[in-house]
From Swiss-Prot:
The gene is nifU. InterPro entries: BFD-like_2Fe2S-bd_dom, BFD-like_2Fe2S-bd_dom_sf, FSCA_dom_sf, N_fixation_NifU, NIF_FeS_clus_asmbl_NifU, NIF_FeS_clus_asmbl_NifU_C, NIF_FeS_clus_asmbl_NifU_N. Keywords: 2Fe-2S, Iron, Iron-sulfur, Metal-binding, Nitrogen fixation. This is Nitrogen fixation protein NifU. It comes from the Bacteria.
């Protein structure tokens, strides 16, 4: 389990500025629900003074993304001018504001930082420069392109494949894009004159309790894992859900597997989780567990969305 600071927990249990913002002046949207993580950032600009007077968010993702990072981002930009927000709020600023994050969750802060320029471009009536060109999609599982990887590497001084995965999610599922990620990483390091992992130790992420360099991921093989049979795949799904159930049961809820349809896994939340405001976060927790267990991207959906007659 990851160790979170008290400030992260505070934003998780008492998120600020969640929900739609009527008559927002600037709106930025990044990510995709299909890929498991999406964020809509909405802001109002003070007509009398050059600063943001309000900011709200709507998001779909894991618990730290839903409540902590997005909530913290809105708190950080309220009161700042458009230019101040654009120039002073990076993903590292978000992580430091929260007192540090586990390396594995830095991707949530990166998405927050990606939404900000999108919202400001919308406010200025400008089209956000789209540096995604055809053929540049690197990680199909999470929809991560080369441009996003390049920005994450440059801003955060990343030097290894594992760090890129922590900060962007790229390569965190089927692993077939690892070689392409390393090509992008090496190109950025060569362009900036930075040293790679063979010449220097990796940078230390924002500090957090219980983290040491030895806790980083071991390098995974580049080849794709062996294909599972249908029975093996079903068993892994069942075992992963059973492994997740105790965490949900501690809060008075439960989850049960209903059906499997290719990449779509249908589950039913019961008890306290049924109709809970955090049910989307619970579903994403189950999804993350299944992606990790299967080594492929899958979508976890509520049983109510199961096609009629299935």
């Amino acid at each position: 389990m990851w160790n979170y600071t008290d400030k992260v927990k505070e934003h998780f249990f008492n998120p600020k500025n969640a929900g739609a913002l009527d008559e927002a002046d600037d709106v930025g949207e990044v990510g995709s629900i299909t890929c498991g993580d999406a964020l809509k950032l909405m802001m109002k600009v003070n007509p009398d003074q050059p600063g943001h007077r309000d900011a709200n968010f709507q998001t779909f993702g894991c618990g730290s993304a839903i409540a902590s990072l997005r909530s913290a981002l809105t708190e950080m930009i309220i009161g700042k001018t458009v230019d101040e927000a654009l120039g002073q709020v990076t993903n590292r600023d978000i992580a430091e504001y929260l007192g540090g994050l586990p390396p594995e969750k830095m991707d949530c802060s990166v998405m927050g930082a990606e939404a900000l320029p999108a919202a400001i471009a919308n406010f200025k009536g400008e089209g956000l420069v789209d540096d995604h060109e055809e053929g540049e999609l690197v990680c199909k599982c999470f929809g991560i392109d080369a441009a996003m990887i390049e920005r994450a590497v440059t801003v955060n001084s990343l030097t290894t494949l594992e760090e890129v995965t922590h900060y962007t999610k790229a390569g965190g599922s089927c692993q077939t894009c690892h070689e392409k990620i390393e090509e992008v990483l090496e190109a950025v390091l060569a362009k900036t004159g930075a040293v790679g992992p063979a010449q220097a130790p990796s940078p230390t992420p924002p500090a957090r309790s219980g983290w040491t360099p030895s806790s980083r991921w071991p390098r995974r093989p580049r080849h794709a894992p062996a294909k599972l049979t249908n029975v093996q795949r079903m068993q892994k799904i069942m075992f992963a859900i059973e492994d997740w159930r105790p965490q949900i049961q501690r809060d008075g809820g439960d989850v049960e597997l209903v059906d499997i349809d290719g990449k779509d896994i249908y589950v039913r939340l019961t008890g306290a989780c049924s109709g809970c405001s955090q049910s989307a976060g619970t579903m994403m927790g189950v999804q993350a567990k299944l992606v990790e267990a299967l080594g492929e991207f899958v979508r976890v959906k509520p049983a109510s969305l199961l096609p009629v007659g299935a």
